[in-house]
Amino acid sequence: MAPAIRQLATGLLLALSWAPTTRADSSAADYYVKSLPGQPAGPPVKMHAGHIETDADHNGNLFFWHFENKHIAQRQRTVIWLNGGPGCSSEDGAMMEIGPYRVKGDQLVNNNGSWHEFANLLFVDNPVGTGFSYVDTNSYLHELDEMGDQFILFLEKFFKLFPQYAQDDLYFAGESYAGQHIPYIAKHILERNEKAGPDDQWNLKGLVIGNGWISPFEQYGSYLKFAYEKGLLAQGSEKAKQLEQQWKICRKQMAVDIKIDISECEAILQKILDVTATLTTSGKRNCYNMYDVRLKDTYPSCGMNWPPDLTDVTPYLRRKDVTEALHINAAKNTGWKECNGAVGSAFRAHKSKPSRDLLPDLLKKVPITLFSGAEDLICNHIGTEEMIGNMEWNGAKGFEVSPGNWAPRRDWTFEGKDAGFWQEARNLTYVLFKEASHMVPFDWPRRSRDMIDRVMKVDISAIGGEPTDSRIDGEKGPVTSVPPSKGSNNHPDTKPGGGDKGSSTNDDETQKQVDEAKWKAYYRSGEIVLVIVVIAAGLWGWYIWRDRRRRSGYQGVAGGDGAGPGHRAGARGLDRFQDRRTARDVETGDFDESELDDLHVETPREGPHKEAYAIGDDSDEEDIKGKGPERSGTR
């Protein structure tokens, strides 16, 4: 090949690699999920799933599952969802809370409260070793800044694979121990943005944390207060006196050093569940469900058998046809586990300060929404409300709007039912969901979607939709959700009062407007790439023509030589009650998935790294002598 042509070929390859589709799109195709077993009839949801490497030295890969939005209202948005633990899979969120589908038996049904109505959803099993993610078993993470660094690397590679989402408005949402993860990730994103050019910054627009484990000081102090308020314990009783003594021990330890989890304080929750347990007629003990105190469970599980959907979700995610659809490696031996006890045991974060300390600085730049289910004990609303009341940010303390005056609690009604209240001041919003558990979207999917739509300032009138009847202080604003689809086989909202029910307004005209909005959102990037390809082809043809005229003996470009590159929700308590359903089951299989060119988005394969990996391993429910069951890693 003539030097001029060789130089041109090199230049064209570099130019094309710069274009936002080329290599990223061809690699993204490897992640495409064509369909899911048991998927309901109707328009399919566009999905991508698979692993992205975040630690090449220790075979660390994070698993993601991405769902494209149904509608685009005003602008593109992406919600990145994380569950708790540490070590509990975000498939809890995908399959039991905010994702497009719920599992019934071996089939999927539509979730009318799915948050993908107006936002792309990205679920990530975080940190490495959680759920379908994996890493060498001696390389679990220990601190929150380590986790934050790896998550930034994950996002860099994800947006390189899917550049069409890189400029979306980004919202991080999650629950429980994600109350630690999310603020740390946000801090790392803001630090990255300070160093990045204007066109390379990520549009972090908000953080949304439900029943979060954020401030150990207030949360540990709330256990007894919540037990008294709900009538689980009688204040002044002998049992209460025992627990007050344990609270004194806890406070003494916190006076020395406040860590993210403190065993002397974890014991308070364990003892509440122990002393309030009752004997059944069969001689077995029943205890309160720590995630929803309206319910009971067998002791010492105390909520680990909940939610009931888990009995269908676990076998579904272990099916071979499902793991193949999600691009999980065939060498995986034991299948998906909700929580990985080894991850939780390693991730003690003893050198990390509680994320509560990050909130005042974050609130200067990013709106934050905290929400609570009123019936959750383990990360209860009293602790969250007291944390807010004690915290100073943006020039004042708590929800104070002027000296001595606090922002009011504004009544929230949803389709005529009392749903809770909203309270907000200086970039912080608090939402209380009445009659809701630790997993609010599980109980009230459509109410939770109404919340996220308000947070994202969705105006569905932009696509011709009709808002559902959601009112704050009697006012019905435009930033609300659509009613559910008529006749769909949705997992219903089953709370007393009839749940969240409605009818569909998504007619053909609405769909037409939605399609037009999608086209406008993606048109520009496709047009740019098309222009580049046309120019490149024209230049290439001109050089070939000119060289053939100059060298009559030339027989073709490259002569066939192949020119160019060929190549859970966690919960805490009961002495590290952080891991739900914990059962040690360390993976020993290898992982052999396709390399993604120079992105190193890969999984381990045969060779020097053939050793033990952890992929969502976890331990079975065990009665730890003298402690009750251990959830080594989940809030």
From Swiss-Prot:
Family statement drawn from the similarity comment of this UniProt entry: Belongs to the peptidase S10 family.
Cellular localization per UniProt:
Golgi apparatus, trans-Golgi network membrane
Gene Ontology BP terms: apoptotic process; proteolysis
* Single GO molecular function: serine-type carboxypeptidase activity
Q: Which residues are glycosylated?
A: 112, 427
Per its UniProt entry, which superkingdom is the organism in?
Eukaryota
Provide the top EC class: hydrolase
The scientific name of the source species is: Verticillium alfalfae (strain VaMs.102 / ATCC MYA-4576 / FGSC 10136) (Verticillium wilt of alfalfa)
GO CC annotations, alphabetized: membrane; trans-Golgi network
Biased amino acid composition, Gly residues: 556-567
For whether the record's keyword set contains Hydrolase, the answer is yes
> What is the catalytic activity of this protein?
Preferential release of a C-terminal arginine or lysine residue
Which coarse location class applies to the principal site listed for this UniProt protein? Golgi
Keywords, A to Z, come to: Apoptosis, Carboxypeptidase, Glycoprotein, Golgi apparatus, Hydrolase, Membrane, Protease, Signal, Transmembrane, Transmembrane helix
**Which stretches face the Lumenal side?**
25-524
Name it.
Pheromone-processing carboxypeptidase KEX1
Cytoplasmic compartment spans:
546-635
Gene for this chain: KEX1
Active-site residues? 176, 376, 438
